[in-house]
A protein has these predicted regions:
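Short acidic, hydrophobic short linear motifs in intrinsically disordered regions
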Residues: 20-34
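A short, conserved structural fragment
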Residues: 51-61
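Short, amphipathic alpha-helical interaction segments positioned at domain boundaries
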Residues: 69-83
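Short amphipathic alpha-helical interaction segments
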Residues: 36-52
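Minor-groove-contacting beta-hairpin "wing" of winged helix-turn-helix DNA-binding domains
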Residues: 62-68
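Short alpha-helical segments that sit at the start of domains
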Residues: 1-21
Length: 83
């Protein structure tokens, strides 16, 4: 998955969690938000690289959530983009 796609997924996690860390979002909701529907033949989402960078984490129930580091990273990215 491209870096651009991963950043898009971080934005989706932000929106669906209302900008809160540790709020689980089901992968199906992430898929829907990025335009991947039921039966999509593309490669399944691999969010591990976001976890490897401590920006998101997989919760025990199988959902994904932003970490506090992910929240801080997104806020900084948005501040820099506004300049």
């Amino acid at each position: 998955m491209s870096r651009r796609d991963l950043m898009h997924i971080l934005d989706v996690l932000w929106r669906l969690s209302h900008g809160q860390a540790d709020v689980g979002v089901p992968v199906t909701r992430i898929d829907d938000a990025i335009g991947r529907g039921h039966g999509d033949m593309r490669t399944p989402l691999n969010l591990q690289s976001l976890s490897d960078e401590s920006l998101a984490m997989r919760l025990p129930e199988g959902t994904w959530a932003l970490t506090p580091q992910g929240i801080a990273w997104l806020k900084e990215d948005r501040e820099l983009s506004d300049r």
